[in-house]
């Protein structure tokens, strides 16, 4: 048995409060989800807006492997909009509960049934595959639900879907519910929401009951409490039930990160499968056990989903354990560099920060990149900034054994500091900042900040970076690190 996967990140997922994707962003996510292996991509709802249609058209024009689908109500206008986007199929959604019929549509069961049949026939006549979906099906009369599906199948629907729209199923009820719909003569899909935190469990129960397709979103994003998380469903199917999907499981982590970054909906650290702590272990018994045999505390390997294993360190770390971990990370350091890394790790630990492998690598790379002989050395930096104060910085540098004091203003404290440094160096070198990139490499307001910059001096461009808990100091140190590399190169070439 192989379960089909309909990814609805671009439709149901985009209904997450605060998420709005541009056509270009939707295309980038669709390309990634297609590479991931989803069978069907619900690209959006074509009737929504011209921008939405533009996004769907961009996706359909790519000739992707996946079937491209548009959400549609049982209204011909919705289907026409989908047809204009050249989609392969429509996810034709019809409310079926009396609650929805009375208070939302203000229609009778007979009227809704007629609409469902008419729009199914209309879409099929225009060469569009129909997946007929019952909204709020889990609060619907089962006889009416079966009637809608039977009539829809006779009208040409190739697949049917029963939506647990407000997430009220339990795994036991989910099994019984989908079992009761599995013999209607068309492939059945499960579509579960996460209002009680049961979307994944209910989806798995529905698939066990006879459904052959699951609707899910990357990271479980969606309105209210979200949808079934695609990564959790497919890994559970593979690992716990030995059921295959078309998903390339090794791409799950990178896909999750991309979607989180582009939607701005970041993951809780302990999110199953793709969270930063999903394979992280504190020092002690667990870490020791995992180092000896990973299966002692890991049900699946991080490599299976494209993730990595992490060991968290803090203020109790010793130099021996630190060196061992650096060796395991492939980083050979001299004793003096080790002590500087050790000092920084201890400092972060005293601030209440746990240091992960990502932190440690960033700190070590920063320390190993520090040159012994600096042309420019920072003596002092002072920043003044506020809502009624122009950001101002003063810096004291030692440049070739000369002390230089300068001040600068900018649009923010980082800009002011860089302006002051550039003014300090005007008599020594013409340095241009080409690129500036900042990233919080760990979560929280006390996150480590990784600053990467590109500097130009003449025809030479170099990159430099610094990692600090303080964005201003990280930016200043990255800038000066780059300046020192440029000027040191000139010295070695005899041009300075």
From Swiss-Prot:
Residues 3-253 form the Pyruvate carboxyltransferase domain. Its EC number is 2.3.3.21. One of its GO terms (biological process) is L-leucine biosynthetic process. Gene3D superfamilies: 1.10.238.260, 3.30.160.270, Aldolase class I. Keywords: Amino-acid biosynthesis, Branched-chain amino acid biosynthesis, Isoleucine biosynthesis, Transferase. InterPro entries: 2-isopropylmalate_synth_dimer (IPR013709), AIPM/Hcit_synth_CS (IPR002034), Aldolase_TIM (IPR013785), Citramalate_synthase_CimA (IPR024890), LEU1_arch (IPR011830), LeuA/HCS_post-cat (IPR054691), LeuA_allosteric_dom_sf (IPR036230), PYR_CT (IPR000891). It comes from the Archaea. The keyword Heme does not apply. PROSITE patterns: AIPM_HOMOCIT_SYNTH_1, AIPM_HOMOCIT_SYNTH_2, PYR_CT. One of its GO terms (molecular function) is 2-isopropylmalate synthase activity. Pathway: Amino-acid biosynthesis; L-isoleucine biosynthesis; 2-oxobutanoate from pyruvate: step 1/3. Belongs to the alpha-IPM synthase/homocitrate synthase family. Homodimer. NCBIfam families: LEU1_arch, PRK00915.1-2, PRK00915.1-3. Catalyzes the condensation of pyruvate and acetyl-coenzyme A to form (R)-citramalate. This is Putative (R)-citramalate synthase CimA. The lineage of its organism: Archaea, Methanobacteriati, Methanobacteriota, Methanomada group, Methanobacteria. The gene is cimA.
């Amino acid at each position: 048995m192989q379960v089909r996967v309909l990814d609805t990140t671009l439709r149901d997922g985009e209904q997450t409060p605060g998420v709005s994707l541009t056509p270009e962003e939707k295309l980038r996510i669709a390309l990634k989800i297609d590479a991931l292996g989803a069978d069907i991509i619900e690209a959006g709802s074509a009737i929504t807006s011209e921008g939405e249609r533009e996004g769907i058209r961009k996706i359909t024009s790519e000739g992707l492997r996946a079937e491209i689908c548009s959400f549609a109500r049982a209204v011909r206008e919705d289907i026409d909009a989908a047809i204009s986007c050249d989609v392969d199929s429509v996810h034709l959604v019809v409310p079926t509960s009396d609650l929805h019929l009375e208070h939302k549509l203000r229609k009778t069961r007979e009227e809704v049934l007629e609409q469902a049949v008419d729009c199914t026939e209309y879409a099929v006549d225009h060469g569009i595959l129909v997946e007929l979906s019952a909204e709020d099906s889990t609060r619907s009369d089962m006889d009416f639900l079966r009637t809608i599906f039977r009539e829809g199948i006779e009208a040409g629907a190739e697949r049917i879907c029963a939506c647990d729209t407000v997430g009220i199923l339990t795994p036991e009820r989910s099994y019984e519910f989908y079992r009761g719909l599995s013999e209607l003569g068309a492939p059945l899909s499960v579509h579960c929401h996460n209002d009680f935190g049961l979307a994944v469990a209910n989806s798995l129960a529905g698939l066990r009951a006879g459904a052959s397709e699951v609707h899910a979103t990357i990271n479980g994003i969606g309105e209210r409490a979200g949808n079934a998380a695609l990564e959790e469903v497919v890994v559970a199917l593979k690992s716990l039930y030995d059921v295959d999907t078309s998903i390339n499981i090794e791409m799950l982590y990178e896909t999750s990160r991309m979607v989180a970054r582009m939607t701005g909906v970041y993951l809780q650290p302990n999110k199953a499968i793709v969270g930063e702590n999903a394979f992280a272990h504190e020092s002690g018994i667990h870490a020791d056990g995992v180092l000896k045999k990973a299966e002692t505390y890991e049900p699946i390997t991080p490599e299976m989903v494209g993730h990595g294993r992490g060991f968290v360190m803090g203020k109790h770390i010793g130099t021996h354990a630190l060196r061992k971990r650096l060796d395991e990370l492939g980083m050979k350091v001299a004793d003096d560099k080790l002590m500087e890394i050790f000092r920084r790790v201890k400092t972060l630990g005293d601030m209440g920060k746990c240091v992960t492998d990502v932190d440690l690598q960033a700190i070590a790379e920063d320390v190993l990149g520090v040159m012994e002989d600096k042309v420019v050395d920072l003596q002092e930096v002072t920043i003044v900034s506020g809502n009624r104060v122009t950001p101002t910085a003063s810096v004291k540098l030692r440049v070739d054994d000369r002390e230089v004091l300068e001040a600068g203003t900018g649009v923010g404290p980082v800009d002011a500091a860089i302006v002051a440094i550039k003014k300090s160096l005007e008599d020594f070198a013409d340095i241009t900042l080409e690129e500036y990139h900042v990233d919080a490499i760990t979560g929280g307001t006390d996150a480590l900040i990784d600053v990467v910059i590109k500097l130009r001096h003449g025809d030479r461009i170099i990159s430099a970076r610094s990692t600090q808990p303080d964005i201003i100091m990280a930016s200043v140190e990255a800038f000066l690190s780059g300046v020192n590399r440029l000027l040191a190169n000139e010295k070695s070439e005899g041009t300075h």
